[in-house]
């Protein structure tokens, strides 16, 4: 039993990128602890957390690297992108400039990793829909053009956060067979929970 567990437990590095105050840390905190802190504190440099995810017949360990959005820390980021499995590019749907700037973050990822990385574009803060500056269609269009995954979330309300990480886990290298075998079961178990969310965004 322990042998099978050791074999199936693979580690994957997920790097969170994006401008300052788009909610990178809040997404990680919601996923890790199911909590949201209203007090904003800028990430200084790089933070690291790890969480084990239990899927249908596979267990994976996700290493979550939270990067600072400030310009003065930009020189640190390429070294963290270099050996990542997933790059999660976050923007704030109430800040159009943060959406525009996702292009340079994606360019940085491509420069370091080429096509050997999963890139996910995430529009955060859907709980502030009345202040929205970026439509969901704009996000989906950009993701389609770049052939990457797109999802909107609210770290504050918890909307789509678990689903985001579940979908990322399904896309990880070596997970193709698991996804093929259990797609229907996953859809049935996840979607109703998300639809029942109290968030109207």
From Swiss-Prot:
It is found in: Endosome membrane; Golgi apparatus membrane; Nucleus; Cytoplasm, Cytosol. It comes from the Eukaryota. One of its GO terms (biological process) is intra-Golgi vesicle-mediated transport. Changing residue 70 to L: Growth inhibited in wild-type cells; localizes to the plasma membrane. Keywords: Cytoplasm, Endosome, Golgi apparatus, GTP-binding, Lipoprotein, Membrane, Methylation, Nucleotide-binding, Nucleus, Prenylation, Protein transport, Transport. GO terms for molecular function: GTP binding; GTPase activity; protein kinase regulator activity. A lipid is attached at residues 199, 201 (S-geranylgeranyl cysteine). InterPro entries: P-loop_NTPase (IPR027417), Rab (IPR050227), Small_GTP-bd (IPR005225), Small_GTPase (IPR001806). It is a lipid-anchor. One of its GO terms (cellular component) is nucleus. The modification Cysteine methyl ester is found at residue 201. GTP binds at residues 18-25, 66-70, 124-127. SMART domains: RAB, RAN, RAS, RHO. Pfam families: Ras. A motif (Effector region) lies at residues 40-48. Belongs to the small GTPase superfamily. Rab family. PANTHER family: RAS-RELATED PROTEIN RAB (PTHR47977). Has a role in retrograde traffricking of proteins from the endosome to the Golgi. Involved in protein transport to the plasma membrane. Involved in the secretory pathway where it has a role in acid phosphatase secretion. Required also in normal glycosylation trafficking pathways. This is GTP-binding protein ryh1.
């Amino acid at each position: 039993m322990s042998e099978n567990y050791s074999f199936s437990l693979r580690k994957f590095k997920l790097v969170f990128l994006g401008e300052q105050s788009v909610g990178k840390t809040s997404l990680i905190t919601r996923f890790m602890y199911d909590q949201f802190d209203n007090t904003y504190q800028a990430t200084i440099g790089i933070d690291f957390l790890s969480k084990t995810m239990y899927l249908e017949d596979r267990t994976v360990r996700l290493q979550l690297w939270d990067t600072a959005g400030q310009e003065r820390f930009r020189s640190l980021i390429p070294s963290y992108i270099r050996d990542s499995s997933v790059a999660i590019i976050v923007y704030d749907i109430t800040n159009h400039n943060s959406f525009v700037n996702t292009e340079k973050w994606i360019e940085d990822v491509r420069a370091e990793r080429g096509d050997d990385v999963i890139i996910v574009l995430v529009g955060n803060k859907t709980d502030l829909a009345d202040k929205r500056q970026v439509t969901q269609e704009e996000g989906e269009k950009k993701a389609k053009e770049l052939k990457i995954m797109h999802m909107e979330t609210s770290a504050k309300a918890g909307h789509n956060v678990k689903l985001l990480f579940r979908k990322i886990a399904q896309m990880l290298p070596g997970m193709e067979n698991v996804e093929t075998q259990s797609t229907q079961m996953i859809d049935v178990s996840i979607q109703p929970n998300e639809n029942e969310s109290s968030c109207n965004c």
